[in-house]
Swiss-Prot record:
Any one of the GO BP annotations: translation
Subunit-structure text: Part of the 50S ribosomal subunit.
Record bears the keyword Ribosomal protein: yes
GO cellular component: cytosolic large ribosomal subunit
Annotated PANTHER family: 50S RIBOSOMAL PROTEIN L15, LARGE RIBOSOMAL SUBUNIT PROTEIN UL15M
Organism of origin: Xanthomonas oryzae pv. oryzae (strain KACC10331 / KXO85)
Residue ranges with Basic residues bias: 39-52
Stated name of the protein: Large ribosomal subunit protein uL15
Compositional bias of kind Gly residues: 28-38
Region (Disordered): 1-66
Keywords, in A-Z order: Ribonucleoprotein, Ribosomal protein, RNA-binding, rRNA-binding
Length: 152
C-alpha cells in the first residue's frame, strides 16, 4: 500500500529543527571553546564557586553607604505612648466632661496609650470640658468656640 505523503503517522513525528538542542558542557577541554575557565573569566568572585552572591549594601570593600552617612533622628517614646484623637471624633461622646478614661471607654484611645492629645480636624458641634487631656492650639480654639474649655 502506498502512503500519501500528507498522511500523519506516529512514527513520522519529530520535533522541529532546532527545537531540541543539547545543553552546552563547559570545562571539558580547550577544543570545545569553553574549557579551562568555562566562560567565567579569570579570578574574581564571579569565577569562584558560589560567586556573584554578595550581601545587599556590599560595595567591594569600600566603606558602605550606611556607615558613611551620619545617624539622624530618633523615635520618640512619648509619641508611642500618646494617642491622637481627632476633634470630630469627640462628637461621638456625650457633651460634658471628657477625660482619658472616657476616651478609652469610647474606643478612641488604644489600650497601649498612656496619654491622649486632641488634634483639630473637622467641626465640633457639642460643648466639651477636657480634663487631663492635652490639645493642640487649633483644637483648643475650636473647643472654646463651641462653648467648652480645656483644663490640663
Amino acid at each position: 500500500m502506498r502512503s500519501n505523503p500528507m498522511t500523519l503517522r506516529l512514527n513520522d513525528l519529530k520535533p522541529a529543527d532546532g527545537a531540541r538542542t543539547q545543553r552546552t558542557r563547559v570545562g571539558r577541554g580547550i577544543g570545545s571553546g569553553l574549557g579551562k575557565t568555562a566562560g567565567r573569566g579569570h579570578k574574581g568572585s564571579f569565577a569562584r564557586k558560589g560567586g556573584g552572591k554578595i550581601k545587599a549594601g556590599f560595595e567591594g570593600g569600600q566603606t558602605p553607604m550606611q556607615r558613611r552617612l551620619p545617624k539622624i533622628g530618633f523615635r520618640s517614646k512619648m509619641a508611642r505612648d500618646t494617642a491622637e484623637v481627632l476633634s470630630y471624633q469627640l462628637d461621638k461622646l456625650d457633651a460634658g466632661d471628657v477625660d482619658f478614661v472616657a476616651l478609652r471607654a469610647a474606643n478612641l484611645v488604644p489600650s497601649r496609650a498612656k496619654k491622649a492629645k486632641i488634634v483639630l480636624k473637622g467641626e465640633l458641634s457639642k460643648k466639651f470640658v477636657l480634663k487631663g487631656v492635652a490639645a493642640t492650639a487649633g483644637a483648643k480654639a475650636a473647643i472654646e468656640a463651641a462653648g467648652g474649655s480645656v483644663e490640663e
